[in-house]
Amino acid sequence: MVCRAAVKIYDKRQDKEMIIPCHRHCDAFLILKEFGYKKGEDFKEIEQGFLDEHDRFMSRIAAWWEAKNCNQFTQAYKNELAQEYYHPATPRQLFSEDVW
């Protein structure tokens, strides 16, 4: 189950990868800014994705399939999918607006 958005970064200050959980991906960058981090100088963005109920990081594509399998899409997003043609095996990316 998709539980929250997350951004994986490489923290140059601490010399390690970190995952920042958030409601929307842009919130992670606001959090970093609040702590005085500057993109490129203090951290490098690795990937935007989501966390599951076990705090495992998923790519946007893996999270889309997880949300689909767990029936988590908003009704508006389900309606949008019904209006467009897409092949069920075509990889899609999940955006937080699709699930909450």
Locations of the language-model features?
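Linear-motif-rich, low-complexity cytosolic tails and juxtamembrane regions
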Residues: 1-48, 52-100
